[in-house]
Amino acid sequence: MATVKGLLKGLRYITQIFDEEKDKDMQIGFPTDVKHVAHIGSDGPATNVPSWMGDFKPQENENGQVVSRADANNNQIGEGVGLQELLPPTDKPKHKKTRRKSETVSQNGSPPRRNSSASASDMQPKNTRRHHRSRHGSIDSSNDPSVRRRRVVSVTTNDMEGSYPLSDSSTHSRKSTSRHRKPKGSGGGELSMKKTKGKTENPIVESVDTCNDNNISDKE
C-alpha cells in the first residue's frame, strides 16, 4: 500500500507540473500591459524599442536629431520647390481665360473680336462637315431605289420632250408625203388611163379634122 501511495503522489506531482506549465501558457496580461503599435516611439529614443522594430531606423538630420513628421513634411515641401521651378508650368490655359475676360471688360460690354484666322479655322470644320454630309447624302440617295426611279422617270421625260418636236415634224412630213403619194398610188392608175385616153383621142380628132379640111379643099 505504501508503494501505491508513493506512486500516486508522484503522479500528482507530475500532473501539477504539467498544469502549472499549461497555466503559464494560458496567462494573459492586463490590457494596460500591451502598447498599441501607433504609440511605439512616441516616448522618444530613451525607451526600449521592441525587437521587431530594430530593423527600422529613425530618420536623423546631420546634427543627429530625430526628425518628426511635421519637420519631414516641411523639409519635403522646401526640397520640392526647386523641382517645381524646373517643371513646366501647368496653369497656362487659366491665364488665357483671364486675358479674354480682361479684353471683354476693357471693351465695355462689347463682344470680343475674333481674328480672321481664328474665324477661318472655326468655319473650316463646319464647311467640311457640310461637304461630307452632302457627299454622303448623294451616295446614299444614289443607292435608294426610289431616287433611282425618279432619275429614270426624269430622264425618260426629258427624252420624250426632246423627241416630241421631231416626232411632230416627222408625222407632218409623213402625212404630206402620204397625201402626195395617195393619188400616185391608188388613183394614179385612173389618172394615167385618163391621160392615155386623152392622148389616143387627140390624134383621132386631129386626123378627122385633117380629113374634113381636105374634103373642103377638094370641093372648092
Curated annotation (Swiss-Prot):
This is CRIB domain-containing protein RIC3. Over-expression of RIC3 in tobacco germinating pollen induces depolarized pollen tube growth. GO terms for biological process: establishment of vesicle localization; pollen tube growth; positive regulation of calcium-mediated signaling; positive regulation of cytosolic calcium ion concentration; regulation of actin filament depolymerization; regulation of calcium-mediated signaling; regulation of exocytosis. Interacts with ARAC11/ROP1. Residues 127-136, 172-184 have a biased composition (Basic residues). The keyword DNA repair does not apply. Residues 61-77, 209-220 have a biased composition (Polar residues). Functions as a downstream effector of Rho-related GTP binding proteins of the 'Rho of Plants' (ROPs) family. Participates in the propagation of ROP GTPase signals in specific cellular responses. Functions as a downstream effector of ARAC11/ROP1 to activate calcium signaling that leads to F-actin disassembly associated with exocytosis in the tip of the growing pollen tube. Counteracts the ARAC11/ROP1-RIC4 pathway, which promotes apical F-actin assembly associated with vesicle accumulation, to control actin dynamics and pollen tube apical growth. Residues 28-41 form the CRIB domain. The keyword Cytoplasm applies. InterPro entries: CRIB_dom. It comes from Arabidopsis thaliana.
